[in-house]
Amino acid sequence: VVSWKRTQRGIIMEALKLPKKAQKDLNVIFESMVARKIKKERELTAEDFIYQIKRLAHPRATSPIFGHISEYVEGLRELAQRLRKDNDAIVAAHRARYGSADKGLPWLDLRPYELSGATAIDRYTYRIRIKGKYPQFMYWLAMPFFAPIPYEADRFYAQRGMNQGRNITFDWYPVGTGPYMLTENDPNARMVLERNPNFRGEPYPSHGEPEDEARGLLRDAGKMMPFIDRVVFSREKEGIPYWNKFLQGYYDRSGIASDNFDQAVQFSVEGQATLTPEMEAKGIALSTAVATSTFYFPFNFLDPVVGGLSESKRKLRQAISIAVDFEEFISIFANGRGIPAMGPIPPGLFGYREGEAGINPVVYEWVDGKPKRKPIAVARKLLAEAGFPDGRDRKTGQPLVLSLDTVARGPGDSSRLEWYRRQLAKLNIHLEIRATDWNRFQEKIRSGNTQMFFMGWNADYPDPENFMFLLNGPQSRAKTQGENSANYQNPEYDRLFEQMKNLDNGPERQAIIDRMLRIAREDAPWAWGYHPKDYALSHQWVFNSKPNQI
């Protein structure tokens, strides 16, 4: 049985008295704490949650998480097969009558369909049955994929003509029970949230991270939320007007663009970011946090030059990993807002190690209490051992030419691409830039027709599995359309991943992660990249707010 608990990561669940039987067959029971209003007509019930879980299997919804979640929710895959069969019959009949099935398909009511993995116990309680053990499932439940959906709304938006140039769709006019209603929805100009008069109310948190109390973030503990009646999101298309309006107080919060960085932030001798006197005089506050994101530089393992697990290919990738100086990249292109990545896992998540224990020993040394990138001479030695002394093929004498696939976004990218060329030029490697549009770039990655490129990943949920799976062989983008864009495959890494992914956080899981990181660092499927650091500015009248990195 589980209960809801609010943490700094959002709403997650805390297991209570979970029986050992749950190791094989986890029954998760959810209880709606109070009756919640959808409209004045009726309250939220357990069936609304179940209806949405069924929608994950709906062939017209094309849920992006169906493939993954159907491995765990009992009966979801079988439900999808039944729905697909019935939907095919509806489509065939519609096409026979109207000559087309592109628009106006009749509504497919999911209520009559049984789903063994999601059943109602009573009006406000439902059970989800999971195959095996999957601790990360609690994070999925905090995501929109599991938000309750009333069948009435599903039926309403399925009416003929609703989405024919009118944007009368669920995502534009959502139905829910939260503290605010979306009363104005024009993403190109303005979006407005207004207080929901039917909201049940919810107390402000009474506990948080250790520093929250010192920062005054728990001063309103226990008071009923929401505290404000209206939230307005405005889109400013030009950076300078946006920044000036923030300084004048028209906007409450702001990020910091590169052009305004020096006006807002200065660094101490120790490298600590602080506000400039101008910002302090305005009463503006600065908050910083390393994002739960990783930007990385993959090598395509299907490529005959940079891919593969042979010793020579491994040393080639290691040499490039040392040569591409991401400390310099962060300084030049991110105003110092980031930290070099030592592996896939960003700081703040279980599995990430601080200090000397956490460095990538292939790329870094520990010097004077901090990591230091190995000298370029080490990279040149590795390159020679890989069969390319001084950047030339030992057998043919031909210069080594590699390619970087990227999206052509405009002249502003030229300095960044030239920087990549200079990094490989340290090894006398010539880098060709293959710029293309976004769709063609994605097609190249899907088909494995790349050599090197740049990618990023933001956490779906705060668990190391959500980053380590980016190097899991069965997740190969070219082979299975998974998220392993490097198409990296190491049998030992994959075996350890299967052991690690569903373990609870603890010494056993940490030990397995350490072994996986040693393998990945040695194989160097990525040049590792960096974790960005978010900077946010707030005016003095903004309270009870802190960055949420998920």
Model-found features: residue ranges?
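Detector for C-terminal structural segments
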Residues: 132-135, 186, 190-191, 195-197, ...
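A local structural motif
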Residues: 128, 207, 223-234, 396-404, ...
